[in-house]
From Swiss-Prot:
It catalyses: breaks a beta-(1->4) bond in the backbone of a xyloglucan and transfers the xyloglucanyl segment on to O-4 of the non-reducing terminal glucose residue of an acceptor, which can be a xyloglucan or an oligosaccharide of xyloglucan. The lineage of its organism: Eukaryota, Viridiplantae, Streptophyta, Embryophyta, Tracheophyta. This is Xyloglucan endotransglucosylase/hydrolase. One of its GO terms (cellular component) is apoplast. It comes from Brassica oleracea var. botrytis. It holds the Pfam family Glyco_hydro_16. One of its GO terms (molecular function) is xyloglucan:xyloglucosyl transferase activity. Its EC number is 2.4.1.207.
């Protein structure tokens, strides 16, 4: 039988070929109820828990968005969430899943899903803030429709690197480059947050496309509320020095050859913006970019 040449078929072939030599992925998250590790933070009446708290819906309408956060703060670990994004015409709508500290010179690790008009792909924007400095945006298209089913978005964070994953495929690496003068998140515990809100002043085509409220309510669905991190709400020094957790071990200090191959695939096929190659904003390439293999 002839093989289809559609983009989706090519993606499937790539993933099947990759599965023959699998890199070591982060551990699979364990599903637990929302209330075990998270609490609502605003617009409680725009959230709905289903199936005994194993599933959560965030609801955005013309009046308000909504959000939640983790109960504890964490310093290093593996942080994941199963998310199904709002469907249809979602221009102007942003769904975010991120870690952030709370002080002025804050650290932050971001997934932001930027909605689009019906038929146009959602954009996934990632960013890393260190010591209050961000401006490290990367944007990709996803190789699937993120509103059709749940997909897993996760961050591996240890003393050596931060890795963003989509369904265990690495889409971005931010290495510890302190020796190059680049700050790295290592001493500020972070909470996990997620929110759904209207950002039509910037999210879609730089704010040219406005939210169509005739399509509201917009609903983002969540599962997988386990947190596999070192809780530092009381004693951050323990998390920074103990080194016995699985994410500290040698196999998680760098990507292996197969993971770098997948990262290159994302960079070559799906990346639409990379701050490392933006010479208008950065005439001199940021120091971390070569180490992160982003050029």
């Amino acid at each position: 039988m002839a093989v289809s040449s559609t983009p989706w078929a090519l993606v499937a072939l790539f993933l099947m070929a990759s599965s023959t030599v699998m890199a070591i992925p982060p551990r699979k998250a364990i599903d637990v109820p929302f209330g075990r590790n998270y609490v609502p933070t605003w617009a409680f009446d725009h959230q709905k828990q289903l199936n005994g708290g194993s599933e959560l819906q965030l609801i955005l309408d013309k009046y308000t968005g909504t959000g939640f956060q983790s109960k504890g703060s964490y310093l290093f670990g593996h942080f994941s969430m199963h998310i199904k994004l709002p469907a249809g015409d979602t221009a102007g709508v942003v769904t975010a899943f991120y870690l952030s500290s709370t002080n002025n010179e804050h650290d932050e690790i971001d997934f932001e899903f930027l909605g689009n008009r019906t038929g146009q792909p959602v954009i996934l924007q990632t960013n890393v803030f260190t010591g209050g400095k961000g401006n490290r945006e990367q944007r990709i298209y996803l190789w699937f429709d993120p509103s059709k089913a749940y997909h897993t978005y996760s961050v591996l964070w240890n003393l050596y690197q931060i890795v963003f994953f989509v369904d265990n495929i690495p889409i971005r690496v931010f290495k510890n480059a302190k020796d190059l003068g680049v700050r790295f998140p290592f001493n500020q515990p972070m909470k996990l947050y997620s929110s759904l809100w209207n950002a039509d002043d910037w999210a879609t085509r730089g704010g040219l496309e406005k939210t169509n409220w005739a399509n509201a309510p917009f609903i983002a669905s969540y599962r997988g509320f386990h947190i596999d991190g070192c809780q530092a709400s009381v004693e951050a020094k323990y998390c920074a020095t103990q080194g016995r957790m699985w994410w500290d071990q040698n196999e998680f200090r760098d990507l292996d050859a197969e993971q770098y191959r997948r990262l290159k695939w994302v960079r070559m096929k799906w990346t639409i913006y990379n701050y490392c190659t933006d010479r208008t904003r950065f005439p001199v390439m940021p120091a971390e970019c070569r180490r992160d293999r982003d050029v």
